[in-house]
Amino acid sequence: MPASVVLQQPDIPIAAIATPVGVGALAIVRMSGKGVFGIADRAFRKKSGKAFSFEAAEGFTAHVGTLFDGEGMVDEVVALVFRAPSSFTMEDMVEFTCHGGPVVVRRVLAALLDGGCRLAEPGEFTRRAFLNGRIDLLQAEAIGEMIHARTDGAFRTAVTQMQGGLSRRLLEMREGLLQSCALLELELDFSEEDVEFQSREELRGEVIRLQTELSGLVDSYQHGRLLSEGVSTVIAGRPNAGKSTLLNKLLGEERSIVSHMPGTTRDYIEECFVYDKTMFRLTDTAGLRESEEDVEHEGIERSYRKISEADLILYMLDVSGEGFREEAVSAAALCAGHPEARMILLANKTDLVKDSALRIAALETAAGSPVVPMAARSGEGIEELKLLMASMVEGLDKLHEASVLVTSLRHYEALRNASDALHNALGLIEGGEATELIAFELRSALDYVGEITGKVVSEELLNTIFGQFCIGK
């Protein structure tokens, strides 16, 4: 357990519903901590009628019986027994599988709370697993990512992290940093004797090796982010170009208001859809134009901010009127201001003109980006657009197979800080600076790596991480 945090109320067992709330065939209510076997004994009767005690039961065993509360029988249940330290939380645990009706589940939970448990905080079971040493902080976060994964690639990346893939890499780096720090500390302790326990050339080589490893992980975040969060895809264009219609067609539902009146979308709307194993986070933005109205103007400003953050820009033009060539040039200039983003021009309303082929050729020349002709209202061109979107991120779903990926902004920032500290240390070594200064930078890098795995952690950070979990996890 990290020295800076302690387990809250360790003597009070916790209980919570572990399955989604609602109507279902089955549900699970679990409890963990000291005294859970006694609580279970008071609420449970074995179906066979034979005397039974959870205190005496072996771990990893299942028992069929009836659960009671103060009003009588609640439900027939299956009780699973997990004995410390061989449970998820490394504490004694009991899980009751009951029927999935909301009244049944609520009464099962109430019986355990009346018996002496308190209601678990969000993520508290996983938090206890971390604090008791069952998993590190990376693995705890991976559990949350696995639960919320929307694609196979994101799921498999989370599984790799949960199994310790990234943890092992960081542990190896941490051992290297610890070794170098220890040798520098020895030098400081014996400074009067003017000895080097590790030559500066050897230290330089070790720092370069560690920084190269860290830089590789930092660089992997760009792809890891796309796998975990999805490809940020902004639908942009002037008012009444058909942006909201496109969003609805891509989603297959009426999510955005469609109107012939320009300026209907005053703020951006975000939704996700998965195509060819890749998740796209779609943002339907307010139409880009000059506006004197405060509300619409703010929506347009937000549109520009979303465009600046996008991985992919779907710029929609109405080719049924005049000025579309000039707008294509403006769209290209807009995208050029964000070179990390890619753009697809959508030539909408081609069904309303006879010379659509000529107009599309003019767009390709003007913008230098791929052009998809479409009639969004009828759905023409939607499948071609999806194929092009998928081709632009081709191979993303297989990235998890090649290496360990960083998917969390928190991990990315800590790794970048650690890499910066090693960069500073390398400059000090090459400049022949004092041992104290070099040691300070190496210790900083060590602390940043420790922040990721949980070796260096605060109560506030744990509350932020585990507060994003559901109560029963």
Curated annotation (Swiss-Prot):
Signal peptide extent: none
Localization terms from the record: Cytoplasm
Keyword Nucleotide-binding: yes
SUPFAM superfamilies per record: P-loop containing nucleoside triphosphate hydrolases, TrmE connector domain
TrmE-type G domain segment(s): 230-394
Disulfide cysteine pairs (residue numbers): none
Amino-acid positions noted as binding Mg(2+) in the UniProt annotation, renumbered to this chain: 244, 265
Gene Ontology terms: biological process: tRNA methylation; tRNA wobble uridine modification
GO cellular component, one term: cytosol
Keyword Oxidoreductase attached: no
Cofactor(s) named in the record: K(+)
EC nos: 3.6.-.-
Any one Gene Ontology molecular-function term assigned to this protein's record: GTP binding
A Pfam family: MnmE_helical
Chain residues that bind GTP: 240-245, 259-265, 284-287
Binding site for (6S)-5-formyl-5,6,7,8-tetrahydrofolate: 30, 95, 134, 473
CDD domains from the UniProt entry: trmE, TrmE_N
Quaternary structure and partners: Homodimer. Heterotetramer of two MnmE and two MnmG subunits.
Primary role: Exhibits a very high intrinsic GTPase hydrolysis rate. Involved in the addition of a carboxymethylaminomethyl (cmnm) group at the wobble position (U34) of certain tRNAs, forming tRNA-cmnm(5)s(2)U34.
Protein's name in the database: tRNA modification GTPase MnmE
Taxonomic lineage: Bacteria, Pseudomonadati, Chlorobiota, Chlorobiia, Chlorobiales
